[in-house]
């Protein structure tokens, strides 16, 4: 069974502790894809929900001291119930405090994967890359950045940009699909982190396969959305992207995938 069919069959509960700007978009995107999102932020509630969850997303976009404590509490509970956790270290290269939080979560808690743009992941491993907070484009060595992070942290890494790279156990693949409209809609990267959290726990020991499918489904849905009437306009693209996530099939992935 393909990872996409498995996701739709299991409809995994995905706990999304994400930034305030993208909660609605993230929830709707996951529902369209076939997952079951919950946007809980109360530790006692998380204790109950994570017992049944298939994934946890920690997105540090809306960073406060209280949220830092929440991330820590959620990761402790996730480890207790063996729930795979994905970290999205938003803008961790933009300042010392964000970097400190990201380092703490990576070094002191169990993560199943890290998803970030080239600038964010490069900052975690000490590689100098021009980055504007949550935006990073035109990076030539994205596969090297992914491998460096995979080697340093010994967990799967997803690095996004004009080309995306996935590194698992020293192996790297690059994804050459996607839409130029994605950076023009706030929250597309954050939703991707939640999609990664939806796929990462579907098949134990098959993380590379699951992550590759997650990236292809997401990026090809973007291509489909852009090709639809007025898909070149951000508002229309946003709606059509959700529609494409709902409609995308394994046949679409097989036909349009560009992987190296």
UniProtKB/Swiss-Prot annotation:
One of its GO terms (molecular function) is magnesium ion binding. CDD domains: THZ_kinase. GO terms for biological process: thiamine biosynthetic process; thiamine diphosphate biosynthetic process. The keyword ATP-binding applies. ATP binds at residues 115, 160. Keywords: ATP-binding, Kinase, Magnesium, Metal-binding, Nucleotide-binding, Thiamine biosynthesis, Transferase. Catalyzes the phosphorylation of the hydroxyl group of 4-methyl-5-beta-hydroxyethylthiazole (THZ). This is Hydroxyethylthiazole kinase 1. Belongs to the Thz kinase family. HAMAP family: Thz_kinase (MF_00228). NCBIfam families: PRK09355.1, thiM. Its cofactor is Mg(2+). The gene is thiM1. It comes from the Bacteria. The lineage of its organism: Bacteria, Bacillati, Bacillota, Bacilli, Lactobacillales. Pathway: Cofactor biosynthesis; thiamine diphosphate biosynthesis; 4-methyl-5-(2-phosphoethyl)-thiazole from 5-(2-hydroxyethyl)-4-methylthiazole: step 1/1. It is an enzyme of class 2 (transferase). Its EC number is 2.7.1.50. It catalyses: 5-(2-hydroxyethyl)-4-methylthiazole + ATP = 4-methyl-5-(2-phosphooxyethyl)-thiazole + ADP + H(+). Substrate binds at residues 39, 187. It comes from Streptococcus pneumoniae (strain Taiwan19F-14).
